[in-house]
Amino acid sequence: MKKIILLLIFFSLAYGQNIFAQKRTVSGIVTAADDKAPLPGVSIRIKGLNEGAVTKADGTFSIVVRNGKYLVFSFLGYESQEVEIDGHKEFNVVLKPAGNDLNEVQIVGSRNANRTKLNSASAVDVIDIKPLLESAPQTSVTQLLQYISPSFHSVNGSNAGDAGSALSLAQLRGLGPDQVLVLVNGKRRHKSANVNYGGLGNGSTGYDLNSIPAGSIDRIEILRDGAAAQYGSDAIAGVINIVLKKKTDDLSVNTSGSTRRRGDGATTRTSVNYGVGLGNTGGYINATAEYATQAIALPAGRADAGLYNGPIYGGGANTRGYDAIYTKAIDDAILASRGINRHFFDQRGGGANPGQDALLSFNAGFPLNKTTDIYAFGGISSRNSQFTAVYRLPGWTSRNNNFIYPDGFLPDMENNIVDGSIAVGIKGKVGDWNVDLSNVFGKNSFSNRVDNSLNASLGLKSPTSFDAGRYNAGQNTTGLDFSRYFEKVLKGLNVAFGAQHRIESFQIIAGEEGSYSKADQRTIVDVDTTTGGIPYLSNAGVTSLNGLAAGSQIHLGFRPENAVNVSRSITAGYADVELNVTKAWLISGAGRAEYFSDFGNVFTWKAATRYSFARWLNIRGSANTGFRAPDLAQSYYTSISTTFQQGKGVDILTASNQSAAARALGIPKLTPEKSKGYALGLTSAPGSNIELTVDAYLIDIDNRVGNTGNFTSTDVNLPADVKTLFQQTGAAQANFFYNEFSTRTKGVEFTGSYKVLLDKGNLNFLFGGNFSKNEVTKVNTPKGLEAYKNVILSPGERARVTTNIPAQKINLQGIYSVDKFTFLLRTVYFGKVTTASLVSAADPLNPVYFYQNLKPIWVTDLSVGYRFTAKLQATAGVNNVFNILGDYTDPSIAGLRNPTVVGIQNGSAGIQPFIKLSAHL
């Protein structure tokens, strides 16, 4: 009772003080620190009270203050600022752009510390992560970018099979995942160890962006221009620079959860970020811990999507005489006797793989003196992903053992992905030069475990779980960079140069013997069908049937002869110059020479210019040459995967480019891809609250590395070394890495933003689009293989390169903040794509493919956030609010299963409600 009385007295005093406090009017103007322009729509709140105002179109404001000591100014995209009133009646408030320390502005694509995205000579997007984490449905790095950047493309699992389904690889401008370079805090990041198989970017390696906690990121910069001359190999399509948080004295917690309409596919993600100041001179350490879960998702769309309608206990892929006795009625009777139905054999996958992610990262810096800082950043992550493949039915006698799995089995592949990196460096002044000495080490490891499977060729001796091996990729980069700004050379000259030494490594570790072994060829024993109507081997476990599938099914283990441990060294030097000829005219140039220990020298260059016709209009253009060194994995990777063609499981070997079989076919060793790129664009800021960029681009790439189509073991014209390879591995088909084709990519991109005061609230509208076209301009057919032109570059691979990524993408997003509410409305247009699916390989020289056009789709997200206090916000919303799905697989290629949604445009999750909670303590 005493506490209640005290509370009543407290609120009475507070209320009375508010009534009788003397009124005063405070006014002023709010401007932006970067361009000094007035900011309209800035929210002004009296700290501790539910009173406030917003700035007018000219940035001015006026607010009546009855009580309170502080005014809080906040605006989307800028850092909030707290100002003490202390008797003042007029204020001139300057807001800094969010995430930018104005003493250290760094925009990727320029080594001039004062360059901004609008006055850059190349197209750069700068994406603030904070509002997306609070209001958008997406939570992982790749999905956040997929729905905000028109030139960026990534779908869950990249529509790949096996280990590739664990990754969501990043692509820019429709080019490959290995033709974009990723930096963290401006330093080169290491790649994933995995070689993507069967999906977008087939045959490529890429960057595992989702191993970086989204909660650790301050902003992401996307350079949409070739930059190999500035940053080295891979930067053909552009560069993604992830800038980590430096903020201190703030504990931020973001947690979210979502589920699909049928209750499957639930996700959770919790991120905790905290920064601590070190000393009194600006030192800091900012750390993030993040944990995420993904539950299994069923195929989206119709309730019977993926339902199997064919023979179950007989009539399998390798039909033999006794299978003729099995009819649908007999199958259904057996199912009923077992208490199951056809849904027991459903596919289990319908989007992202189920799994768990545990991520840690940090970013730190400490001044040694007024001109010298030491810094470090890095992280470690462990991610588990489970992939299930095609159900092995009990009637598939070549792939099942009915004593072990009477009802067949659904093999499961579990990938454990461990990723770690550490960067340390020291930067400061040596005379008038800025000097940065750094070392960055990174490693990515994929381990493959197969469960609920078997090696059919071993009979009852087969294990059901296998260690199928693992592979590792590492990179260590040491760099020394110099830069200096000469203020008195014309209107300013920035000179940068430096050197790097990089060591890259790749390793394959063999799996356990049962994961790859094949039993001896022995006499076929008869099949007895007298036991419960279920076929079994009369002498199973003692004698193996000739022709049964060898190795762990879903993913065959790496064989000892495929194990490798290779490395290479790269030495590079570069120079980068930017000259402001006049206040309006900027020219820049860069050159880079690199030496690779495995294939020699490469030189690239870039030239760019920008001219300001007025404060609101810049014209820019660039030309560059680039290259991409083949990854070690592409040169040495060997693996066997199972693909189902016309309902029949086929073991396909991806053979090493270094193998004798490759040489026998006439396939040479890999060489670098080389590119030429051109861009022309404009930027405009007609007002302080609107920005617009438009850029056209053309990229020619020669000798792109990819997987050939599949050579078949039944082809009598193949060289002896290739036939030996088939005999050793038991594979029915084989493909090789090869510099097989050249391409041309052209397109137009536009981006823009508009900030406006709307009915006492702030509206931040973002828009962008990319319209592109990819075409194959040349196929490099090895001498002697002219008849195999449709195998060297198969129609399926041609489609992956040219038409599997939407040629048109439009992003529209509005965030409206008023009082305590924040509303997000976003819609993204994914253009038409065309797929090519194998129908028949009866003629190995001319395989038959079915082409399917998938219609364009609009995907719309909606959310509403409520800010309970200045430090606590809750958000609820719906991803894909109209439940828009892509087209279903055409029945002619769906086989004996009902068609499922083709998720190649944006994934296939369908409608997905979500909630988020963001707190700052």
Model-derived regions, located:
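N-terminal periplasmic accessory domains that precede
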Residues: K89-L95, V141-L144, S168-A170, D208-N210, ...
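Short, acidic, small-residue-rich periplasmic hinge/interaction motif at the N-terminus
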Residues: S27-K47, Y70-Y78, D86-E134, T142
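Gram-negative outer-membrane beta-barrel transporters
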Residues: A696-V839
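Outer-membrane beta-barrel signature, preferentially recognizing the C-terminal barrel domain
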Residues: D357, G420, I554, F558-S569, ...
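Periplasmic N-terminal accessory/gating domains of Gram-negative outer-membrane beta-barrel systems
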Residues: S120-L169, P177-D178, K187-L209, E221-A228
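Outer-membrane beta-barrel transmembrane domain signature of Gram-negative proteins
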Residues: F409-V424, G428-K429, F441, S453-W585, ...
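C-terminal beta-signal and adjacent terminal beta-strands/loops
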Residues: I4, I701, K773, Y829-A841, ...
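Surface-exposed extracellular loop regions of Gram-negative outer-membrane beta-barrel proteins
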Residues: G238, V243-S258, T267-R269, G355-N363, ...
